[in-house]
Amino acid sequence: MVATSKQTTQGYVVEAYGNLLRVHFDGHVRQGEVAYVSVDDTWLKAEIIEVVGDEVKVQVFEETQGISRGALVTFSGHLLEAELGPGLLQGIFDGLQNRLEVLADTSLFLKRGEYVNAICRETVWAYTQKASVGDVLSRGDVLGTVKEGRFDHKIMVPFSCFEEVTITWVISSGDYTVDTVIAKGRTASGAELEFTMVQKWPIKQAFLEGEKVPSHEIMDVGLRVLDTQIPVLKGGTFCTPGPFGAGKTVLQHHLSKYAAVDIVVLCACGERAGEVVEILQEFPHLTDPHTGQSLMHRTCIICNTSSMPVAARESSIYLGITIAEYYRQMGLHVLLLADSTSRWAQALREISGRLEEIPGEEAFPAYLASRIAAFYERGGAVKMKDGSEGSLTICGAVSPAGGNFEEPVTQATLSVVGAFCGLSKARADARRYPSIDPMISWSKYLDSVAEILEKKVPGWGDSVKKASRFLEEGAEIGKRIEVVGEEGISMEDIEIFLKSELYDFCYLQQNAFDAEDCYCPFDRQIELFSLMSHIFSSRFCFDCPDNARSFFLELQSKIKTLNGQKFLSEDYQKGLEVIYKLLESKMVQTA
């Protein structure tokens, strides 16, 4: 098992500076250990971040007003841990994994020093025993299962147990609470262990048992610009940087609603509370398009908003990814949405300043890039010992000041992610939703997706690259038109420009308020993209730029109407037929 000190070490406060305390201690402590500081008849949770001789520096996760020199500090002997077990789904936690709905029963405001269990101890679960007496199991092996919503939640040998365990006793299948002992075992060294449905794991250590494998399954999110131009594989990593008001949070909310994954973990790290309230109001009433159930049944929310303690921002990010890794070990596909990693980086900068460390660029700590890289490296697809596969896809929103993508957090993120979805203020102001700029965005998964789709859609990769070239050429021609007007542009270039605008308006943009167009299934995307490819490869006959513009505006109107029709309905089929007839009326040849 992960070592836990049985003796309680104590100390006292020597100096306080904001939420950073210098504490003298007698005994043994280690970096990352949880400490509790006594103030006003309550105990405030803290974490050791530096050990120097017989003194430690601890960051307190609460308001430190009232702490005086000589205040008693108790060290717990264990690291900052997440409580893992059935009941995490539909849960709303703060950065220290306190259930906010339980805290709300005691007060409208978060009381200082109040901590509750993350998993309800009274809920009864229908437990099915899988292990038998005499089985030799190791960390991550299944002891039994409980039904959590539509998922079979696997109760596993704790991941903190690094020895093989011989099962000596098991409970029969039945209804039990999470604290019920469901099995007993003996390790090779002779230690007797008891297992319940709950286990703990240090949140800053990677949670992995199994073999990391290459991602080979597309994560369909229902946004054409993402699925086609900037695709992401399950187990991949991507980021969504953008300036204030560009739509980062709206994009993350869309991903949480429509991404083709089993579990979604939402980490609201330092963002406004109103955005979390919006999720809590909407999600119970929204239906998962993949299962038909409420979206909350597959969602876990870590809520550490801008009004909550800054020190807990770091723990909220690590808590979210630990919960996501836990569900990945069950062979499930998990999506972690972190909004925003910039707020986490700002918390790192604040504590680094108080530690008087040598600052890096823009006063961020010199180790910022390695911290961000270590976070994204915890994603990926994993093959378990039983042959099943799970994946953890990470999406991090980045909020660069003034939309400057050259700042340290964005640059450190871009060096480690597999896809970059850059949001543009200009596109957002022009009401082009989603405001992802395909000209600056990229994905390393494009060739992998092309290989996966090659059997279903021959030439998919080449067609996407051709569409990207049309966008680039169209943008260049558009700049020339602004300078010299349409009179100085050839008819061929005007046609390329209008085709690129048509592709942008009718394919890359979607209507978030339309029941059909807000989510576009992959089969529908393939058919619409086939239509766009047909338009790209066709040449048309026009007398003048005005006639060309009129034709493409009519075409745009009909395709927009088509996007709002129910897929494969009678109206949809008629609309598609009308569009192809309109194209034939002006077409002179196909390239």
From Swiss-Prot:
- GO MF annotations for this entry? ATP binding; proton-transporting ATP synthase activity, rotational mechanism; proton-transporting ATPase activity, rotational mechanism
- Kindly give the InterPro entries that the UniProt entry links to this protein: ATP-synt_VA_C, ATP-synth_a_Xtn, ATPase_a/bsu_AS, ATPase_F1/V1/A1_a/bsu_N, ATPase_F1/V1/A1_a/bsu_nucl-bd, ATPase_F1/V1_b/a_C, P-loop_NTPase, V-ATPase_asu
So where does ATP get bound?
G242, P243, F244, G245, A246, G247, K248, T249
> Is the keyword Chaperone in the record?
no
Catalytic reactions on record: ATP + H2O + 4 H(+)(in) = ADP + phosphate + 5 H(+)(out)
Task: State the UniProt keywords alphabetically.
Answer: ATP synthesis, ATP-binding, Hydrogen ion transport, Ion transport, Nucleotide-binding, Translocase, Transport
List, alphabetically, the Gene3D superfamilies matched. 2.30.30.650, 2.40.50.100, Bovine Mitochondrial F1-atpase, Atp Synthase Beta Chain, Chain D, domain 3, P-loop containing nucleotide triphosphate hydrolases
Cross-referenced PANTHER family, in alphabetical order? H(+)-TRANSPORTING TWO-SECTOR ATPASE, V-TYPE PROTON ATPASE CATALYTIC SUBUNIT A
Q: What does this protein do?
A: Produces ATP from ADP in the presence of a proton gradient across the membrane. The V-type alpha chain is a catalytic subunit.
- What is the recorded name of this protein? V-type ATP synthase alpha chain
From the broadest rank down, the organism's phylogenetic lineage runs: Bacteria, Pseudomonadati, Chlamydiota, Chlamydiia, Chlamydiales
